[in-house]
């Protein structure tokens, strides 16, 4: 948490985002080690050892809640919860190990810091509660989903974040600029934060990142 304090001293007026993996995603690394393509190891474990799995997920939820609270106390201005591997679950498993746990974490954090903005990232959203806006401020969308179509599934006060393909940022060029503007135009009259659909790739040239920022900040709709 000292790193957060030191970074905040340098950022001054710029917001700093804290983050953590969600319980299910954290558990996939804990149980599987090297992640299998279909998460067969952790899913098999959860079927055969439901009590142990419940204990692990509940424990991780409590630890993540405290970890995020510690980040807020160190100076972050908002938090993001990443549930990268939740898309491999069916509806009932998702409700038990993802949706309920994310709500639990959000409520725990909000109990102490009621005004802290919370962003949630997943690759699947049809399993989220209809009252998601009661505990999340923003939903981060991956590159395989249309932002415009996804917006229809949420109430108007939910912010969406995303969703340029990270590989496109790594490639750069005019097509990247075209796709950035396409996303911006599509989401113009909505609560929206431009971002990638997943993490930035290691091979991404820094000049491409500068170009992305420049394009977003200078964007104006053509009348």
Name each region found by the language model.
Residues 2-223:
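Active-site loop segments of alpha/beta catalytic cores
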């Amino acid at each position: 948490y000292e790193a957060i304090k030191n970074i905040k001293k340098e950022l001054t007026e710029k917001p700093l985002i804290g983050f953590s993996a969600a319980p299910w995603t954290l558990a996939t690394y804990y149980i599987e080690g090297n992640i299998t393509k279909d998460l067969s190891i952790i899913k098999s474990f959860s079927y055969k050892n439901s009590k142990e799995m419940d204990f692990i997920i509940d424990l991780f939820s409590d630890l993540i809640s405290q970890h995020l609270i510690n980040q807020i106390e160190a100076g972050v201005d908002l938090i993001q919860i990443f549930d990268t591997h939740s898309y491999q679950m069916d509806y009932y498993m998702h409700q038990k190990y993802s949706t309920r746990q994310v709500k639990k974490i959000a409520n725990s954090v909000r109990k102490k810091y009621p005004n802290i903005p919370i962003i949630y990232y997943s690759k699947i959203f049809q399993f989220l509660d209809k009252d998601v806006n009661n505990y999340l401020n923003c939903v981060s969308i991956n590159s395989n989903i249309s932002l415009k179509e996804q917006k229809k599934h949420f109430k108007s006060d939910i912010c969406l974040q995303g969703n340029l393909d990270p590989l496109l940022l790594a490639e750069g060029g005019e097509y990247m600029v075209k796709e950035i503007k396409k996303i911006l135009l599509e989401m113009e009259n909505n609560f929206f934060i431009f971002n990638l659909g997943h993490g930035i790739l290691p091979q991404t040239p820094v000049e491409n990142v500068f170009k992305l920022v420049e394009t977003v900040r200078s964007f104006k709709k053509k009348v």
